């Protein structure tokens, strides 16, 4: 057959496909001729950042990805971790940033759909979801619209699909004005012997298309996700996919039923770059070629070209290599669920990716060079600058700490996210033990009497901007700490690395140092990275986002009756600070929100201290010594105890300590927790802390209806609650954004 070429391949067309001149020359050298238009689209999709990780691959290899519980690390649709009794948890986090800015509802909804597919493609039934959302400053004209659309999209898809949203984050910063971030996490449960991978095995086997029909939605989506935005952003709306959670629910049930039948050899969901990426990955991983016949692809639009079919990112679709003798059984299962089932090709032994449309060969390419041997860059990078030290004595104090506390707890970044999570179904499936609003979400493991899992997602972007290395460490440490604060043992993590343009050495430097920090923390805390995603080119008109390496993690609770949450304080309990008093105000919320300053270094993360203090806290929780626990992060001690008071509906009378009041109250030193315990248990905790070398201070007693800290803070729990709960609903109702 001759290869037809439907369009002239011009320099403008090459540039429009996101390919650099040297990359196009590499294509010419590789195939010895000019590519067809369809082939150009295939190379564009497979060689962009979104699919190939060409700028980050070198550095991602340095991350720790193995451990005694790790069954499957990076490289598959999701990571797999052993939780005992033949069970495993399957999880991943992934970005849907660019589509969510252009079309917030569908962008966020299909982000949720995509991550759920990644999990059930592995053979796991999804049991939990989270989402980490970053928006522009509240008074930016688009922020309210984007928040509303994204939250509705996340809830609309997750609720209809039937998975509980158990946690997440919402932040606001002007650096996200032109590029919001939507990072979606999902976890599922499977049996050890029920894990399915994407590596095709065997020659001449049928390649089967499953799920919804193919349309033109999302054509070029992966390429768009690898580019900066500019003034033409609205023109990119057609590249956003449209999701249908009910079809996805049917796809889940059909896939799990088919997997149980023993028919599946390999399976890959169609995400970024659709049919192209899924077929190439399956073949390249198995050292096989793939031949596709596009005339057999189920379509929902007329006159679709080969280019459009290969690059469509229509949702709720899978590609599978099937045992031939199981074909009729497989078809019957998918027909029963009202889904398309079509044999669209076969595996071959020639390592070629061949695409046939209307009797013509429109693509014939070396499959390994598209897949696991795609280009890889060692981009130049600059060491990020360091901030000068900032002693607390050089940071101004406020006249009224009660007013300061009310302002901070009612601020955009620290106020309650109830407005967000009440739009999500947090209880569906009936296993949720701790819902959003605490340190981590907790769910029971179905079919097990006592076992539970904890989930958290964390990063502090302003720390990463000030010091990407310490910021990367801190993201891991805080995720580990939040999981620990429930009494769970952190098992493993997934990363979602959101950065600007890697072609700028200063941005590449942020990425390199953040990965270095993440790796160091994961090694020290035995918290390996088992899956992840990189999202680069998050810039608009040259303005990059804050570096945002989101870390999500999973922890195991052997007995869910021995857990802690932030709202468990009882009258008469003693509060104990574990980890020492605050001294560090550099890059703090106190400095930023009260004085509009972003100076000083990010707090240093002492990983040995993190591990020692965290293991001590976990032991106390599991031994039944603790009635409530909260880790310290943004806003320090004052915010932590205020949140505990609000969630418990109880006041407390606490000692202010001996340090500078603003540092003790609002310092953001790491590796710290506040625990509540009965008076007797608090004595035991203090005694044990002394023996373990864990710094501690007995803060005071729970009771009354006000939070009193020495003679510097005296605020009623009712006023704290009003401030905490009031900001978000007020903002979304259209009230002017105030500084309180």
From Swiss-Prot:
Where in or outside the cell it occurs: the entry states: Cytoplasm
Residues the entry annotates as binding substrate: 95-98, 117, 241, 313-315, 535
Q: What class of enzyme is it?
A: ligase
Locate the residues binding Mg(2+) 1: 94, 533
One Gene Ontology term of the biological-process aspect is: 'de novo' IMP biosynthetic process
Please give the function described in this protein's UniProt entry: Part of the phosphoribosylformylglycinamidine synthase complex involved in the purines biosynthetic pathway. Catalyzes the ATP-dependent conversion of formylglycinamide ribonucleotide (FGAR) and glutamine to yield formylglycinamidine ribonucleotide (FGAM) and glutamate. The FGAM synthase complex is composed of three subunits. PurQ produces an ammonia molecule by converting glutamine to glutamate. PurL transfers the ammonia molecule to FGAR to form FGAM in an ATP-dependent manner.
Q: Quote the subunit structure annotation.
A: Monomer. Part of the FGAM synthase complex composed of 1 PurL, 1 PurQ and 2 PurS subunits.
Q: What is this protein called?
A: Phosphoribosylformylglycinamidine synthase subunit PurL
Native organism = Brucella anthropi (strain ATCC 49188 / DSM 6882 / CCUG 24695 / JCM 21032 / LMG 3331 / NBRC 15819 / NCTC 12168 / Alc 37) (Ochrobactrum anthropi)
Q: Top-down, what is the taxonomic lineage of the species of origin?
A: Bacteria, Pseudomonadati, Pseudomonadota, Alphaproteobacteria, Hyphomicrobiales
């Amino acid at each position: 057959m001759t290869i037809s070429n439907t369009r002239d391949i011009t320099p403008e067309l090459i540039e429009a496909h996101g390919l650099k001149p040297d990359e196009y020359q590499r294509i010419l050298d590789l195939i010895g001729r000019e590519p067809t238009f369809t082939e150009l689209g295939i190379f564009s999709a497979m060689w962009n950042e979104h699919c190939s990780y060409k700028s980050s691959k070198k550095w991602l290899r340095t991350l720790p990805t193995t451990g005694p519980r790790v069954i499957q690390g990076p490289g598959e649709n999701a990571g797999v971790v052993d939780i005992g009794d033949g069970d495993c948890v399957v999880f991943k986090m992934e970005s849907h940033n660019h589509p969510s800015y252009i079309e917030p509802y569908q962008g966020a909804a299909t982000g949720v759909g995509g991550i759920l597919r990644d999990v059930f493609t592995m053979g796991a039934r999804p049991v939990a979801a989270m989402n980490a959302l970053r928006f522009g400053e509240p008074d930016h004209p688009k922020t309210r619209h984007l928040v509303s659309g994204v939250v509705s999209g996340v809830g609309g898809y997750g609720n209809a699909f039937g998975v509980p949203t158990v946690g997440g984050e919402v932040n606001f910063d002007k650096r996200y004005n032109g590029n919001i971030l939507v990072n979606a996490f999902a976890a599922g449960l499977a049996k050890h012997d029920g894990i399915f991978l994407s590596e095709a095995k065997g020659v001449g086997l049928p390649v089967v298309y499953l799920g919804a029909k193919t349309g033109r939605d999302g054509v070029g989506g992966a390429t768009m996700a690898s580019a900066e935005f500019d003034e033409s952003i609205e023109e990119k709306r057609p590249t956003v996919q449209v999701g249908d959670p009910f079809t996805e629910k049917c796809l889940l049930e059909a896939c799990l039923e088919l997997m149980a039948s023993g028919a599946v050899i390999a399976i890959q969901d169609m995400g970024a770059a659709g049919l192209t990426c899924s077929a190439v990955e399956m073949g390249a991983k198995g050292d096989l070629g793939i031949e596709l016949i596009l005339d057999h692809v189920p379509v929902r639009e007329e006159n679709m070209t080969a280019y459009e079919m290969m690059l469509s990112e229509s949702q709720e679709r899978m590609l599978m290599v099937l045992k031939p003798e199981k074909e009729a059984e497989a078809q019957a299962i998918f027909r029963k669920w009202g889904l398309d089932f079509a044999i669209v090709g076969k595996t071959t032994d020639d390592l070629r990716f061949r695409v046939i449309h209307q009797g013509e060969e429109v693509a014939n390419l070396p499959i390994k060079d598209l897949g696991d041997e795609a280009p890889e860059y060692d981009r130049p990078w600059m060491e990020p600058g360091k901030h000068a030290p900032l002693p607390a004595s050089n940071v101004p104090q406020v006249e009224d700490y009660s007013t300061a506390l009310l302002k901070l707890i009612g601020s955009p970044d620290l106020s309650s996210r109830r407005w967000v999570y009440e739009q999500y179904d947090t209880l569906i499936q009936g296993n949720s033990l701790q819902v959003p609003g605490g340190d981590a979400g907790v769910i029971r493991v179905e079919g097990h009497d006592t076992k539970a899992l904890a989930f958290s997602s964390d990063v502090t972007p302003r720390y990463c901007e000030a010091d990407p290395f310490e910021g990367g460490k801190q993201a891991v440490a805080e995720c580990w700490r939040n999981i620990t604060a429930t009494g769970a043992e952190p098992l493993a993590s997934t990363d979602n690395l959101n950065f600007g343009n890697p072609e700028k050495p200063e941005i590449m430097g942020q990425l390199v140092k953040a990965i270095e920090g993440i790796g160091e923390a994961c090694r020290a805390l035995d918290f390996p990275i088992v899956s992840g995603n990189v999202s680069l080119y998050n810039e608009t008109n040259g303005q990059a986002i804050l570096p945002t390496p989101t870390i999500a993690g999973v922890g195991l609770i052997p007995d869910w009756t021995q857990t802690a949450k932030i709202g468990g304080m009882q009258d008469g309990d003693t509060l104990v600070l574990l980890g020492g008093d605050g001294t560090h105000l550099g890059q703090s919320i106190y400095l930023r929100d009260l004085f509009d300053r972003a100076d000083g270094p990010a707090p240093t993360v002492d990983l040995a201290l993190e591990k020692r203090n965290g293991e001590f806290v976990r032991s106390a929780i599991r031994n039944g010594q603790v009635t409530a626990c909260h880790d310290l992060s943004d806003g320090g001690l004052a915010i932590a105890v205020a949140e505990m008071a609000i969630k418990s509906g109880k006041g407390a009378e606490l000692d202010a300590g001996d340090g500078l009041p603003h540092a003790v109250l609002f310092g953001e030193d790491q590796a710290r927790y506040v625990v509540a315990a009965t008076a007797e248990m608090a004595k035991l905790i203090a005694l044990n802390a002394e023996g373990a070398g864990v710094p501690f201070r007995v803060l005071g007693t729970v009771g009354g209806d006000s939070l009193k800290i020495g003679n510097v803070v005296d605020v009623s729990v009712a006023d704290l609650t009003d401030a905490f709960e009031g900001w978000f609903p007020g903002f979304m109702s259209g009230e002017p954004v105030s500084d309180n």
